[in-house]
Amino acid sequence: KNRIAEPLYVNAAYSQEAQYQDIELTSHEGQECDIVISGKLKVQVGTHWEILGPGDSIYYDSSTPHGMIAVDGGDCLFYAIVLNPSGEPIPELTAREPSMSLPQPAPAAAPRRDEGEHLWQRWIDAEENPDGSLKAIRFKNPEHFNFAFDIVDEMAKAAPDKLAMLHIDRDKTERRFTFADISRLSNRAANYFHSLGIRKGDRVLLMLRRHYQFWIAMMALNKIGAVAILASNQLLKKDLVYRFRAAGAKAVLCTATGDCAHQVELALEECPEVTTRILVDGEREGWRSFDEEYRMFRSTYTPMKNESRPEGEDLLFMVFTSGTTGYPKIATHTHTYPLGHFVTARYWHMVDPNGLHLTISDTGWAKAMWGKLYGQWLCEGAIFVYDFDRFSAADILPMFKKYNITTFCAPPTMYRFMIKEDLGAYDLSSIHHATIAGEALNPEVFHQFKKATGLSLMEGFGQSETTMMIGNTLGMTPKVGSMGKPVPLYDVDIVNPDGQSVGVGETGEIVVRVDKGMPCGLSRGYFDNAQGKPISSVRNGLYHTGDTAWRDEDGYYWYVGRVDDLIKSSGYRIGPFEIE
């Protein structure tokens, strides 16, 4: 009734660039009805927006500024029907500035911090701008640093009752660990491992899911100087055989959950060099029981007189990372690595010393070192750990309010699962800051989360071989879809195949210049078991990430892809050889 125009048959062409910009809004008298035929259409009316699919329609007062774009990677066909009850001719359409557009990103504000004396100041000199953002960073005597002794044990002395970890089991059992608890229990574990013949430089593979025992074992190995090898509990026999041999493992700590121990047993039939097998969170014939045995040992630990203190450039841990040819390589990190995550935790995660931080990651991946251990404890913050069997947004979302989680980090895949829930049904007001990394950030994820929480997702970039290199950090206004800017810790550049810097807007490979020294946090190379040491991956003074990006006129970096054939899945790098 009172239709004054034939339906317009509109083909909205998909534009990648439009996904990162405000929708251009127009207005005119009357009403409008849009009906989608194929594809996906994002329609914004005032500050409200909807994603429409085939068969969906929307009806609105067209005097309200409105606009639409095709989304989801393809063109969209739709009918646009304009109606006017008065029957007057349709006035000329006029474009308006998007003053009623979606809430815009805002600079990250500093969390409430106690600016008194902190343990990290003994090792780190952080020069900050007036707004609290990082201007420059220097390290004091990193060659003598040992995280377990110099942070955990010292925190146990300075603030013994301060919460270090709130752990939730798969059956929802709650356990609270103070820094004094972690110090004492890791001392027992260090003495236990030492009694089993594990010494400085020995490699120990950990397959522990998110069991609380992982943190105890890691600190114990840090104290002994044994090298932890991070591994997923999803590995099968062939994966384990390769890892045991490639890393020269002497011992394995394995979860009793699932089929993990059985797969290890199958692998050990071909790997007699792995002489010690320890089961965690259960008992099994032929295995030592970590939980039953380590508590019997002393709660104080001092290296033997004939053993040097592990520190500085001694190896700390290894993590397998995918390559395009052959099996995964073994990235190595030294005892200076945790210092690099000070930037990750303080200026990107915005860890509050009086808050509770949650990063979603299994301990078999380097992401756990980013958000579940080193940087957070270095900043004197507590970590929240939930040892779930399978990720469920509906299971995790109520925990933010229940446990007052203040900062949060996850890959885009997890955020997408969360957004599929009705976020309005959950109280997320405890979250002060949210970060995202691991894959390219879809603008829809950014806007949906912002709509539900009022928080801008702050994207960051790094690798298993590094700490955070590029990010939307404290004081920055994020550009949706951008990784942010390089942090002062790393001398980051974008280069062409000849190693020359490229100009604004040109795509090239992200590299780190190390001609002036190796930054704390950058891998010392890939481990070669035949030589018993890491082999440097630096070429002509550059560490090559294998990732490509371009840089805009404001210095923000925009991710493009890999220079090789690696595939990203839920934030993990997977090589084609592994898939075969």
Question: What are these model-derived regions, one by one?
Answer:
Residues Q104, P111-R112, S195, K223-E293, ...:
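Structural core segment of the AMP-binding/adenylate-forming
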Residues P160-L163, I278-L279, E285, R295-F320, ...:
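Conserved pre-ATP/AMP-binding loop-to-beta segment of ANL
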Residues D161-M219, L236-V241, E293-R295, H335-T336:
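Conserved AMP-binding/adenylate-forming core of the ANL superfamily
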Residues R176-A180, R309, L316-G340:
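Conserved AMP-binding A3 loop
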Residues S183-R188, S299-P303, A331-D352, A366-K367, ...:
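Conserved structural elements of the adenylate-forming
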Residues G225, L339-T359, T363-T406, E421:
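Conserved AMP-binding/adenylation subdomain of ANL enzymes
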Residues R295, L378, I405-A410, I419-K479, ...:
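Gly/Ser/Thr-rich phosphate-binding loop
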Residues G503-G505, V511-F577:
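Conserved ATP-binding/catalytic segment of the ANL
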